[in-house]
Design a protein with these regions (language model features):
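Catalytic core of pol beta-like nucleotidyltransferases
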Residues: 1-21, 29-34, 46-96
Length: 96
């Protein structure tokens, strides 16, 4: 699945959860994914969300794409991973 297709398919879910930004990182952003690779998304919200909303977002995105989706916020990234995530980041939705 190409990056643009992922963005188009998940946009309604992102709107539902009041996401202000979503970007793809990891193997799918680099183009070296395997068929069973998950979808890694960095997201930001218009206002803070709780754990249940994050889990719901992951579940709905996974169902929409028929792939495992991992969602992370920038604040939850370890400093060691942050630079790697930002290097791979491919914006899909909204503004950072």
């Amino acid at each position: 699945m190409i990056v643009q297709e992922i963005g188009t398919r998940i946009e309604p879910v992102l709107r539902k959860y009041d996401v202000s930004f979503a970007g793809l990182f990891g193997s799918r952003a680099r183009g070296d994914e395997r068929p069973d690779s998950d979808v890694d998304l960095l997201v930001a919200f218009h206002r803070q969300k709780g754990l249940f909303e994050l889990v719901g977002l992951e579940r709905d995105l996974s169902q929409t794409l028929n792939l495992k989706v991992d969602v992370v916020t920038e604040g939850a990234l370890s400093p060691l991973l942050k630079s790697e995530v930002l290097k791979d980041l491919r914006p899909l939705y909204g503004q950072r």
